[in-house]
Amino acid sequence: MSKILVFGHQNPDSDAIGSSMAYAYLKRQLGVDAQAVALGNPNEETAFVLDYFGIQAPPVVKSAQAEGAKQVILTDHNEFQQSIADIREVEVVEVVDHHRVANFETANPLYMRLEPVGSASSIVYRLYKENGVAIPKEIAGVMLSGLISDTLLLKSPTTHASDPAVAEDLAKIAGVDLQEYGLAMLKAGTNLASKTAAQLVDIDAKTFELNGSQVRVAQVNTVDINEVLERQNEIEEAIKASQAANGYSDFVLMITDILNSNSEILALGNNTDKVEAAFNFTLKNNHAFLAGAVSRKKQVVPQLTESFNG
């Protein structure tokens, strides 16, 4: 039997890479020929994680079949438009995810582990425990990092009641102080000055099909929202170029202040009225403040979905 590829979503974040690496290792311990790969290069936050724990980044692939794989395992996503290019030509045998289920179907039954927790890594941690497999230090490190990243160090409303205990245990195994390491890791991902506008709007971006519209929702983390808004003109040009190249009807950019847990929403496209209705605000110069919003999954996408379907 050929190897099974394990990967997270396009534009991978720390949880996409961490959960796929950790789950591939677990599957190998259980006798499955599984290999972690990625659908893009690590961002600066994830690069910090991999360097800290001395781990090589998983190879970047564009096609599962080109790697000789007929079967794949998805972590941290399930929607096909967020997955590998030839997802419909291979068999999805497992999914480990903590997002909504949409635009997903398979020809055969499969194992799906879906939980409304803070990260896919939280679920993989439980799978280690359930299978009685010891977690190596570096694997604990990448899972912890995925949880920290997705919950902004357990401050996001996506944080599940079980996540703090998971984080504490993983931090102990990884040999790090949760708060000290977590803050250093998050800050590593806020260095946006070296990024072009095109890179900035694609660092952490996902496409959602909302009532027939292809809506791109991107997020950048920062410690200074105004520093990002100073580049608004070039950011808007990059957004328009991305829309033209990919057919997005709308583009929503979350500029998230990780220290104060707020976001500025920058929106362009055909349905900005629906964006305004979703958050009950008025866009001025294409952007508006959204107090307390840090989670795309819980505080932006559901609201947009309801508004676009309304």
Swiss-Prot record:
Catalytic activity as recorded in UniProt: diphosphate + H2O = 2 phosphate + H(+)
UniProt cofactor(s): Mn(2+)
A Gene Ontology term for the protein's cellular component: cytoplasm
Localization (cell): Cytoplasm
Note accompanying the cofactor annotation: Binds 2 manganese ions per subunit.
Alphabetically ordered keywords of this record: Cytoplasm, Hydrolase, Manganese, Metal-binding
MF GO annotations: inorganic diphosphate phosphatase activity; manganese ion binding
SUPFAM superfamilies linked to this entry: DHH phosphoesterases (SSF64182)
Binding, Mn(2+) 2: D15, D76, H98, D150
Annotated binding of Mn(2+) 1, by residue: H9, D13, D76
InterPro entries: DDH_dom, DHH_sf, DHHA2, DHHA2_dom_sf, Mn-dep_inorganic_PyrPase, Oligoribo/pAp-PDE_c-di-AMP_PDE
Principal EC category: hydrolase
Record EC number: 3.6.1.1
Subunit structure: Homodimer.
Family: Belongs to the PPase class C family.
PANTHER family xref list: BIFUNCTIONAL OLIGORIBONUCLEASE AND PAP PHOSPHATASE NRNA
Name used for this protein in its record: Probable manganese-dependent inorganic pyrophosphatase
